């Protein structure tokens, strides 16, 4: 049995299989999930698990080169926008929400949280550890 880190076997496999520039989406419970990416649904109830909980864990486990968000998060969800800016030392890349949704089609996986606040979504772009 795995002793630490992310125990979810689906997430652990996706992380182990990532290559440089591959992407993972962390989604609120309302984001449409396209056909193609692996769907990992963690939602239990509204708000559980939260966007911030899941994102924090993934940032600990994954080499992240940059993060993309919908530009609308800046005004519609200041709390999660500030969280991302503090949790990630580099500037966030922002695109309009329709472009963001289109980008999810190329992701290796979409992790659905129980988060129910506007634009609580991000795309993590894999970096390298060397």
Swiss-Prot record:
Substrate binds at residues 28, 97, 119-121. It is an enzyme of class 5 (isomerase). This is D-ribose pyranase. It comes from the Bacteria. The keyword Isomerase applies. HAMAP family: D_rib_pyranase. It is found in: Cytoplasm. The active site is at 20 (proton donor). Keywords: Carbohydrate metabolism, Cytoplasm, Isomerase. The keyword Amino-acid biosynthesis does not apply. GO terms for cellular component: cytosol.
